[in-house]
Amino acid sequence: MKTLYRDNKGLHRWLFACGAVLVLFYLFRGNRAAVNFWVYSVTLPFEQFLGRACAALPFSVAELLYVLAAVTAVVLLVLMVHYLIKSRQKGRAAYRCALFVLDLFLTVCAAFSLLWGANYYADDFCDRSGLSPEPVAYDDLVRVTQYFADHLAEASMHIARDENGLFTADRQEILNYADTVYDCLYDEFPFLDMPDQKPKGIFFSKIMSAMNFTGFYFPFTGESNVNMDSPAMLLASTCAHELSHQRGITSEQQSNFLAVLACTRCDNANYNYAGWMLGYIHLGNALYRVDPDAWQQIRDSLPDEIVLDLRYNSAYWAQYKGLTATVTQSLNDKMIKSYGDELGTQSYGAVVDLLVNYYA
């Protein structure tokens, strides 16, 4: 046993170092003051620095790292298989390979916990703003859903449509506007004020669609990344959602709420439409679950072109329903819950409580 440890001393020290970081993380995660200092004075400024550095490049560094990681994984697998075949002491060789893989995995876990996981235990948007997702009354839900439907119809009059009647816009122009979309919220929520880095479009966006993702924030580069293949009508609200993560906000319900608020208040027609659309979709889904007739009445009041956009969006995502999307969303749900967010991916729907309480 001593020989086994001595022969792999570096790998064992690496393992203990990662383990120590994770233990310290779980010990201190309940100390709100310490976590707030770590998030808002250390990691958030560091991620903003990374984001500014990566912003100079015209492509997503996060996507490049994912591709390099996949290629590296294949190369390492081949090398380890070759090493195991050639080794005379296959048990020791297998142990060394397993230890190396474990070290890599724990390194990623430790780094992710420090850069992003800590945010789940810091003061969130609701803590800092005083807003709270309290349970909502039925009448308020109906009224706010109708309010969003009316404003969605108004916003629809100011956007462009293609020959099929669907929403159309230059996707790059939507991305270019994103770094100003939060300007309208700084007076009400001054703690949100920070320089934004424009979201990056993902080249392999169809893979994101297969995984049922419209966007993601990558803390290792400070970049917000968005799906450029999914329906354009919600691209603007996706950009706003991902930019909320640049501010250290982890809760998906709070990020969606901020996306709706920022998009509907800014002076860009495409963002206005996406914001009212995102809010209506969440509110409409909630209303449908409690009163399908009330939902149908509001749905029938929408202009035909909006219904066309909604149907196109549903049809697009329907083609990607399958094992890949199910597994990916399940893993994402478990990851979010592992950091104390009991709603997991369902927190995307809890945005309804915030919207109704705010607009009622």
Regions found by a protein language model. Give the residues of each.
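Membrane-embedded alpha-helical segments of integral membrane proteins
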Residues: 20-83
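Pan-zinc metallopeptidase signature
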Residues: 305-360
